[in-house]
Structure formats: C-alpha cells, structure tokens
C-alpha cells in the first residue's frame, strides 16, 4: 500500500507570529499529523493591510524560535503578503509548497470586509502564484474558538483545497461563529461571500498643534436588507466556507455550473458530521 505524501504547508497570519490564533492552528495541524509545517509570519500585527506589500523599504527576515515543533519558522518585518512573497520567492523556491494557510484571525473576515483583510490578502497572493490557500478567522475574538474536533475539520479543508482542480487554484475564506452561550458549532456550510460590511468610525484621540490624530477601530456592521447565506450561517452557529473565486470577487472565473460542482464536491468531501456529535444535520 502506497503511503500518502505529507503536504508542505506554509502558515502565516496578520495578527503577528506570537498571536494566539496561529498557535491554535499549528496545534490542530500537529494533532492531525498529515503535513510538514513552515511558519513565515509578521513580527508585529498587520491587520487591515489587505494586499499591501513593502515596495520601497527593505523587509527584514529572521529565524524565529517557535515554541511548537515546526520544520522552520521565520519572522518578517512586513505584511502577510510580504511573508508569502518571501516564502515562495526565496525561502522555499526550491521546494514547492502545496498549500498556504492564513490565520486563525482574531475577528471575522466575512462579507465585503475581506477586501480590507490582510488575512485574506495573503490567500489572494498565494492564489496569484498558483498555490491553493485557506483563510481562517474567528468571529468576535479568538477566545470563542472551539478546539474540539477541529483537527479533523482542518485536515479535511486542507486536503479538499489541494485536491480541487480548476484553471485557477482554490482559495477558501473560512469563518468560525461566536457562540455567546458556548453552544457547540452545528457544522460547516459552503456559502458565497455576503455584502455585509464593517466600517470604521473616525474617533479623534488627540491634537498636537495643527495635527489631529484619529483611530478607525470603532467598527460598526452595515447589513443589507436581505441577509447573505454567509451571514446567516454564522448567525445560526455554523462555520462558513466561501470560495474566493466566486462571482463577487475580482477573479470571477467560475461559471454557475462550475460553482455548483464545487459546492457539491465540498459538501461530499468536507462535511464532518459523520465523525462528530453534532446537534443537527446540515441543511
């Protein structure tokens, strides 16, 4: 019997290499034990940087003594896109990566917010280089993340994303719901990205002479009259998984038939209810 080849997975994020979310993701991947793990992540938080990269100033790259066992770990003084570019073009150019993961982000990246997200920006960069990728984000706060059974789900998502064949590599944007009463997640749903939007309200924090300093961190939801399937999935305690090649993204490469096939394939390959004690079946 032929042994399945272990995947080579790059892990990055936008919360920084010391963040709780990336540590959780590595723990789950180590538990699933199907891949060799390589970490290239920002030294400092880079939230809201989208696909920005260091065009003018040099970016520093240095080995990082990661507390969990990984093949290699590197810290970068730039953005998540810088991390992906350096990983593909320098660190691992002789040994191709199979998949790139970004997260787990502290806060959701659903709806139109994915255009601002540096977590998702890293995934878009990976796709541009022909590498499949997954963004993972926890709604509200990383403290809401439920670790039970997640190693199995993460592995299923990874293997599905790598195996999916299309003209362009698959990018998935996965969001985990925040259960206010700690009720277990019901399952996972394949959705399209919604039109919901988080916008920042300018807040004056101080004035120095003629210069005024503002923050945009006070975020408010702007929801359409008709809720998207992504929004409803999260609101009803389901994990959402939205393809970045769907019709509302710049890379609108899937026909309706291909999108339907992707949805069917996802539901057949990734649904994890058979091995878990879920409260209800998926619709």
Curated annotation (Swiss-Prot):
Co-factor remark: Binds 1 divalent metal cation per subunit.
Recorded superkingdom: Bacteria
MF annotations from Gene Ontology: 3'-nucleotidase activity; 5'-nucleotidase activity; exopolyphosphatase activity; metal ion binding; nucleotide binding
Record keywords, A-Z: Cytoplasm, Hydrolase, Metal-binding, Nucleotide-binding
EC number: 3.1.3.5
Binding site for a divalent metal cation: 14-15, 47, 105
PANTHER family tied to this protein: 5'-NUCLEOTIDASE SURE, 5'_3'-NUCLEOTIDASE SURE
Name used for this protein in its record: 5'-nucleotidase SurE
Species name: Chlamydia trachomatis serovar L2 (strain ATCC VR-902B / DSM 19102 / 434/Bu)
Gene (name only): surE
């Amino acid at each position: 019997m032929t042994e399945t080849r272990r995947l080579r997975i790059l892990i990055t994020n936008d919360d920084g290499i010391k963040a709780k979310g990336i540590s959780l993701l590595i723990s789950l991947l180590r538990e699933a034990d199907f891949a060799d793990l390589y970490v290239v992540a920002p030294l400092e938080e880079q939230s809201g940087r989208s696909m920005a990269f260091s065009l003018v100033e040099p970016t520093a790259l240095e080995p990082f003594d990661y507390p969990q066992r990984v093949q290699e770990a590197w810290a970068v003084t730039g953005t998540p896109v810088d991390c992906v570019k350096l990983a593909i073009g320098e660190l691992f150019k002789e040994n191709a990566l199979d998949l790139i993961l970004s997260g787990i982000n502290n806060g959701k990246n659903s709806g139109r917010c994915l255009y601002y997200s540096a977590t998702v920006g890293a995934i878009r960069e990976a796709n541009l280089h022909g590498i499949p990728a997954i963004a993972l984000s926890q709604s509200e706060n990383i403290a809401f993340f439920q670790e039970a059974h997640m190693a199995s789900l993460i592995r299923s998502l990874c293997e599905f994303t790598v195996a999916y064949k299309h003209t362009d590599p698959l990018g998935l944007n996965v969001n985990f719901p925040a259960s206010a009463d700690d009720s277990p997640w019901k399952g996972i749903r394949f959705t399209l990205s919604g039109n919901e939007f988080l916008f920042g309200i300018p807040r004056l924090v101080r004035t120095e002479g003629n210069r005024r300093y503002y923050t945009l961190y006070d975020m408010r939801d702007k929801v359409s009259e008709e809720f998207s399937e992504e929004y409803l999935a999260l609101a009803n305690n389901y994990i959402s998984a939205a393809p970045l090649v769907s019709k509302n993204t710049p890379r609108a490469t899937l026909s309706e038939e291909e999108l339907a096939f992707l949805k069917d394939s996802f539901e057949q390959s990734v649904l994890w209810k058979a091995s878990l004690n879920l409260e209800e079946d998926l619709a």
